[in-house]
Swiss-Prot record:
Keyword Transit peptide applies: no
Name of the featured protein: Uncharacterized protein CXorf49 homolog
Keywords for the protein's UniProt record, in alphabetical order: Phosphoprotein
Skewed-composition ranges (Low complexity): 139-151, 243-255
Amino acid sequence: MGSPEEQSVPGDDFNEESTDPNKNLSLVSGPADSNEGEIRLPSPKGSNLPLVSQQDTSEAPSVVLWTGGCWPDSLVSEEERLGSPEDEKMDGLDFLSQPSVETEQQVANPETPGAKEQPSSESFCAETETGSNRRAPQASGSEEAKAASAATFLPKGLEQSRAWVSPRKSTTSRMLISENVHHPPSEPELSEELNEVQMMRVTICLKDGNHGNQAKNSGPAETGDLARHSNVQTRESFMRMPSSLLTTTRGLTSGMERQTSKELEPFSSKKKQGILWGKGGSKSNYAEAAAGVGALPKAGPRKKMTQKKKPLWDASAVTLGKAFHQWGQRLKSAPAEPATFPPISGVGLPGRSNKCSLLPLRPKQCKNFYTGKRSGAKRTKELQLVAKEDTDSTRDPGSQVQFPTCRAEPPCQSVHQEFSSGDINTRSLQDPGNSQSSGLSQRGILSKKSTPSGDQEEPVGPPAPDSEILQLHGTQGCPRCPELQKEIEDLRKQLSALQAVGEKFQTHST
């Protein structure tokens, strides 16, 4: 900011009737109807500086602004300065904050060496567009891209040749374009250089309510002894440019940041490895080292998680082993239910075989067989059960036992009574696949019973009045008694075999 080349329009002291030679501005415009090829203006050194010729009638005149103690007296007379009242209401320049103005005033001071060497090197040229009433010439002389000034000229009509402006403050953002052009040694070279102006640096200044300046550069600051000649655009073209340039500058900055971040990734990974494994406790000045140190606490929880997972797996294996062990023991110790075994033809259920064992029945049967005693209570119970079974469809009407009338043969009668009143025989008759029930039902010796009696010993009651139905008259003997006795012996053998099989199943199940 302190170099001699950095000069711009002063801010707060700029007015129409300023007497300070270092701060006054003169505005000279070329006539629109001029037929001359060039307009020559005297420079402070005495040489005439030509401007670009305005030969096209469609284009507006070009305005040249000379600054900073170049001319002792203005080229425009006092009469020309006094215009209509409307000229005083025109929009003015946008200026910078006070520090930037002070530095610019110091540079513009004639005592400054840079200003004495090149007093006329700073010039501002505003080219207006055709048909637009608002002209926005802007200038930037700051090298560090921190301060810039924008000027707004609003002549009333295209025919008016001179316009005087007043300063105005605004909060809008301004884009400043600065160029570097050599001081022309001759007149033709200056005109060619003005036509071939190249943009060197773009500076975007944001002005807020506190007159704070924030600048963003799209390129690095360049220093040199070259004079800066800024070509200022009009307001209409100026309003269209900031959005594109803002996006380009932001895109450039974001692209640069991405490239730098991508380039730093492998370097940061190497640094992280070196810091984590080589120098875990030391501090590093690099940002990558800080990132690596910041990543150190993350490794601790992962190791803890892995250590926690191992006991979980061990505990699960132990619990599974215990579960399998208990399951195997439970299989060995748990008694099997009788319902789980498939039904076997000719074999009664184990739970019921205990109640109807043949061991206590044999002495009773033998006792009844040899003594000839018969129990009236059992006979009455048998007859009552036969009378109550009306729902049994398989009961034969002629299946009632026909006993012989001769009472001299008690063994035959006792055998018939044992088979008719025994629980074992009634259960064997209930099984559909039992061969015993099929043989007995074909011969018609025993009556079929669907519901077994609970106990063999029944309470003694009065005999039924219809007990004499079993004794049929007209029969003198029992020719089938020997056959029945053989069948009884065969059935007992079969029952004993079935009972042994049932006992084996019970022992295996327990």
